[in-house]
């Protein structure tokens, strides 16, 4: 092995070791003071919400809030925030919300486990929920 290869190997080793050291702890930075169920994000609520958004808020509060938190802020150790860059339309389109409700979701971004399908919602209900979530996202600079 020449000096260049040894240098590359050592750099890769230290980067990999640092990654595992930093991310091996399951707790997020700043989460030590959170207790189970507390909001994960601070969510600003728009001064005015559309009629469709208000309908969605009402449905969200009955069907989604127990996991996703008040105003979709998430609940520590329970469910993810939907007012988060991960859920912007370029990464999670409106269609992904329809699919999540109908089929459930295998955990892939967060450590909360899988989401079960949600029963008893019409396509119109889901559309209203999406409207509410997108309005919250817009107010929080995500859209």
Locate each region found by the language model.
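Electrostatic cytochrome c docking/interface patches
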Residues: 29-59
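Gly/Gly-Pro-rich "capping" loops immediately C-terminal to redox-active cysteine motifs
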Residues: 57, 69-100, 117-120
């Amino acid at each position: 092995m020449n000096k260049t290869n040894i240098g590359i190997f050592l750099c890769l080793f230290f980067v990999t070791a640092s990654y595992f050291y930093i991310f091996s702890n399951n707790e997020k930075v700043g989460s030590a003071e959170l207790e189970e169920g507390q909001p994960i994000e601070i969510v600003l609520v728009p001064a005015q919400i559309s009629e469709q958004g208000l309908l969605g808020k009402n449905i969200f509060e009955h069907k989604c809030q127990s996991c996703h938190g008040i105003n979709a802020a998430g609940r520590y150790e329970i469910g993810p925030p939907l007012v988060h860059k991960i859920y912007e339309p370029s990464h999670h389109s409106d269609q992904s919300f329809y699919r999540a409700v109908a089929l459930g979701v295998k955990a892939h971004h967060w450590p909360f486990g899988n989401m079960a399908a949600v029963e008893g919602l019409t396509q119109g209900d889901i559309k209203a929920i999406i409207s509410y979530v997108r309005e919250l996202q817009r107010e929080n600079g995500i859209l």
